Amino acid sequence: MPLVYADSSALFAYLHPRDEFSTLVDAAVREDSPDFVYWSWLRFELRHNLRMTRTDSDGEVAWQALRAAEKTAARFRWQGELTADKMLDAAEELSGERARTIDCGSGDYLHVAAARRLNLLSGIDEFWTCDAAQAALASATGLPTRLFQLKHAPGKTAAG
């Protein structure tokens, strides 16, 4: 199975049936059958975003799917070497290299820095995101990148 670093936008779309990118991400998962990198920052960000959607049955289903995946380690591969302090330092370094040329938020830099670090340590097959700016950053650092894009103008995702 390929190992994919999917940022929280892609993982949210994988878990939440009403996310605008859900169909695209689900099709990619069916086609590639990847395992996903999972670490403390990604876990926090994904759980936080899913908690905010637990206001209806789709949000609850997404939350339960996440919890089941975490308990069984189905698809989510924990990466203990990605520690928050080390990844914050790596994101700081990456920001210093690229912030003037690639306009991304700090969380985007953290995801790309973590993916880049893991790629150097053991290799990842791809970086997945629904965020065009983050995809540009990942590509600029040499990561093989898949950007999920809608054919129509984007609306609001279930995550907000």
Positions of PLM-derived features:
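Acidic, PIN/NYN-like endoribonuclease modules and their adjacent C-terminal/linker elements
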Residues: 1-3, 39, 112, 117-160
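Short, well-structured N-terminal submotif of metal-dependent ribonuclease cores
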Residues: 1-42, 52-64, 153-160
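Active-site neighborhoods of divalent-metal-dependent phosphate/nucleic-acid chemistry enzymes
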Residues: 76-133
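Short, mixed-charge aromatic SLiMs
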Residues: 33-37, 67-76, 134-143
